[in-house]
A protein has these predicted regions:
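Short hydrophobic beta-strand element within catalytic cores of glycosyltransferases
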Residues: 36, 282-285, 295
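Conserved acidic donor-binding segment of nucleotide-sugar-dependent glycosyltransferases
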Residues: 297-298, 302-309, 318-322
Length: 365
């Protein structure tokens, strides 16, 4: 099958990682995969390294009709059968190109993107008339789509992100920069406003009052990095927090931590949380994260209310004071059962084959 995936994420992200993993696995299975993404994006570089065809376009706006002919040309030149659109900037232009060329088009929703007012009505037209199917990466996102847009549930398939399990080992390594008596908690995230990180820094101030022997590592870069560092100074927790910048050795880092935290008020699924669970490390997530349907609260992780630093602190303390190593084992078992890359890519293949079969039977649909 000839598949083209569209993405407009400028930075490396969980969504970009999902596209990379899916593309590699689909290529291994004999499919012809191409990716269209932003010039100079992290995804463009990583896809090219895997010798997968990559094309770069920048729509600049959600409805830039001037770019539609370029997308049509890419579709025809590569004999594309299925178009998978993963970013809003490509939703309209790629859907229109797919409709003009009578190709199967799906949208992959990996973050909530809940809208109101005019934007909600515009999206309703898109979802009901221009796309053949929608993939949601969590049950939570599917529920919200059905609720917000009155979509039939059968038009949405939940396919989770996939994990390369062999990259993540449960064997514990030496803890990062601390004595064995210390707890190590990690956040692995883009350091941006929407990630709940300021709330988490406030939670650290509360956590350290009860658990002095804790070291928090924050892995990632972003627009509010300086602001977060200043906040740790203001709250007098800088000695307990280590900013590690962007890192590629995530499996090695996770092997040396006890728990991870995803403080985002809204998160589709969180690749960093899945990687943590694959490493046998339990996670604290908010109810805004798609993992609420996966984690068993107080058994394989901890679930807290979003935007509440006290609740976040209590969730971290509760997990560390429990048998968090057993919670990590249960978290790993969940990932093995539901998120193994071959399993989820098979689900993706079967969906695309079914959509193509329907397209052949009803070519004008």
């Amino acid at each position: 099958m000839n598949i083209m995936i569209f993405d407009a994420t400028p930075h490396w992200s969980g969504g970009a990682n999902r596209i990379l993993l899916y593309s590699k696995e689909l290529k291994k299975r004999g499919h012809c995969v191409a990716v269209c993404c932003l010039p100079e994006s992290g995804l463009a570089k990583r896809i090219a390294e895997e010798h997968i065809p990559v094309y770069t376009l920048n729509p600049k706006s959600d409805i830039n009709l001037l770019i539609v002919p370029k997308i049509i040309r890419l579709i025809k030149e590569n004999n594309i059968e299925v178009i998978d659109i993963c970013s809003p900037k490509f939703y309209w232009v790629s859907s229109l190109a797919a409709r003009i060329t009578n190709r199967t088009v799906i949208l992959t929703r990996n973050v909530p993107y809940r809208k109101n007012g005019v934007k909600k009505q515009i999206n309703r037209v898109l979802y009901h008339t221009l796309v053949d199917h929608i993939i949601a990466i969590s049950d939570k996102i599917k529920r919200e789509l059905v609720e917000d847009y009155s979509l039939p549930a059968k038009k949405i398939t939940v396919i989770y992100d996939g994990i390369e399990l062999n990259r993540f080992k449960q064997k514990r390594a030496e803890k990062i920069g601390v004595t064995p008596r210390h707890y190590v908690a990690a956040v692995i995230s883009r350091l941006d406003e929407n990630k709940g990180l300021e709330c988490f820094i406030h939670a650290i101030a509360e956590i350290t009052k009860k658990i002095e022997s804790i070291q928090v590592i924050i892995v990632g870069t972003g627009s509010i990095e300086t602001k977060l560092k200043e906040l740790t100074q203001k709250l007098k927790v800088s000695s307990s927090v280590k900013f590690m910048g962007f890192r590629k050795d995530i499996p090695e880092i996770l092997a040396g931590v006890d728990i991870t935290i995803v403080p985002s008020p809204e998160e589709g699924m969180s690749m960093s949380a899945l990687e943590s669970m694959a490493s046998g490390v339990p996670v604290v997530v908010t109810r805004g994260c798609g993992l609420v349907d996966i984690i068993v609260n107080n058994r394989s992780g901890s679930i807290v209310e979003p935007g509440n630093s006290h609740e976040l602190a209590e969730g971290v303390i509760r997990l560390l004071e429990s048998d968090y190593q057993q919670a990590g084992k249960e978290a790993r078992a969940i990932v093995e059962e539901k998120f193994a890359l071959p399993r989820v890519v098979t689900q993706y293949e079967l969906l695309l084959e079914a959509l193509q079969k329907h397209k052949t039977l009803t070519p004008e649909s």
